[in-house]
Every structure is written in structure tokens, then in C-alpha cells.
């Protein structure tokens, strides 16, 4: 299939960019962007490659994404080697095809076509690309955003190319994401022999009533844009492995995906109050990986919806479900942020694939967003 979007996607897939290794993907993108007049600023931190690129001045529309991918798993189970892209029955197979090298290719080609048509565009078109999204995300977009904010860089709109669609490209646009807060809780007891419980203090028994109440809390009812806050216990560890030893400690890890109805401080306060209610001895560690954010109807959402309706003749759903994305960092800049990308049915799976025609359509949608906001 001869198509600049598909050809670039294949070139990116051939580079085995296991997070946080970029494997040359950004060099390929930078070469294409510089050729059409972009100024490119590499922003590497630690083992992570990032770049910020821009063309023009004024109101700024940035396209954001990541070049890194998750491991392929058992390569023998793929219909084709995972880093040797192939097209079968109109589907482009390869690790990263959907998440998210297909989107990156669509962004770059859309920019090339846009600049050719509007060489003197009125606004500023930008790219924020990282190689650290799938793993720790500590040296990627968050560090670039901190740098840009420190120098008062302008960012009005940001389109993240995460695979947002479910059945057909553009059927779902993510216009926000829930916050994510993890609690690492250790309940302290006194280790002892199971035959002499009066000489010990079993932390599992101590914690059980508290955990029962915790899992039954209704944190909120959600709102127009967000489902109710959820809390899930992810890990529980206790004991020595022996059947005659009362454990000395119990470790419980639980995660909150919370809406804009709550703050992380509200959640923390309620958990601590519950621990105090049951008079537990404990140690707490919190990890806030992202605050909730929401982009309401405005210029960016309207432009994205218009592009989808124009090219795919469907009205997209505006949703905030799913996991976190780098949009949570970009939203700190005060920008309107949405996510639009290909169908996500096979991301992180064996035989990850994307409809090749969808990538061509996505490039046209991206270009139309550019035309509406910075032409």
C-alpha cells in the first residue's frame, strides 16, 4: 500500500522502541518536521528522549504522543514478527501500530500537508513527543511540561494521539481523565505463635473490619462527565508462609480512580479517619500519578468533533473513562486537552493491529483540526 501515512507508520514500527528506548523514532520524525520549517528542541532527561518542536507564532496547537511501546510478548505467537510491520486484509500489524506509532505518522503527514497548503499559517503548530509513557513516565512529558511552564511557554490546545476509539476511528474522544491515587498501607501487629494468640496481635484480623468498610464506601456519584469514583484493592501481603505463625505486619495496596467531585486530599483524609476509627497502628505512603482533568465544549472539542463528523459522518462520544495518559501533565499548562486516535481493541496485545484506512482518515482529521485552529 503506497501511502505516506502507512509508510511512515511502518518505518516507526520497525524501530523496536521498548520503553524508554526511542530506537531512532524521534530522529525520523524530527527530520520530517525540520524539512517543513519546524524548530526542534531536544529535551532529554535521564534515559528518556523527548522533543518540543514548533512552527509559527501566537495561539498554539500542540500534538502530543509517545514513541515507546510495551514489550511484544511471545514473538512466536504473532502472525508476523512484531517489529516487522505487515498489512493483511487491510490491517497493519506490528507492536505500536495502534499505540501509538500510527497516530504519530498521521500527525506528521497531517502537518506536512497543512504547511504545504498554509505556509504562512497564523497560529503556532507544535509537537511534544516522548519515549517514556508506557513505563515510569517520570522523565517524559511531565519533565517537558515543567520546563515549558518554567519559561512561560504558551500552549492553548493539545491533541493527544492516544488510541481513543472503540469500534471505528473517531467514535470516542477523550475530553478528560480521572485522577489516580495509590495508597500503600502497612498495618502493624505483633508476630507470634498461632497457638498463643493472646501473646500476639494479628494485623489481618485488626484490618479486616476497616477494609470491609473501606470497600463499601460510596465516594461520590460522579457527574455529567465522570463516572463515580472507584476504589480497588490491588495487592495484599502478609504472613511468613508458615501455618503456625501469626504475621507481624499486613500490607495492602489500593488505588482510587477519582472524578472532579473529589480531591486527593479529601480521599486521604477519609482513609486516615477510617484507620483512626479502628485504632490501627499503621504506616501510609501515597502516590498521586495524576489529577483529574476535563476539557469542556470549546474551540478544541468543537474542532475535533467537526473533523470527525466531516470525514467519518459520525457524532463522537465525549468520554473520560479508561486509564491515565500524558494529557494529565499537559493539562497543568491550562491548555484544552483532548485525545483522538485509532481503535484500541488490540493495544498491548499479541498481534496488535490497526486498520490502515483508519490511519489515512486520522491524518485528514488531524489536518482539519489544524485548519480550524491555526490556519
Swiss-Prot record:
Residues recorded as binding Zn(2+) 1, renumbered to this chain, are 66, 99, 162
Any GO BP annotation: diaminopimelate biosynthetic process
Report the superkingdom from the record: Bacteria
- What binding details are noted for the cofactor? Binds 2 Zn(2+) or Co(2+) ions per subunit.
Has keyword Lipoprotein? no
Q: Which family does it belong to?
A: Belongs to the peptidase M20A family. DapE subfamily.
Fill in the subunit field for this protein. Answer: Homodimer.
**What protein does this entry describe?**
Succinyl-diaminopimelate desuccinylase
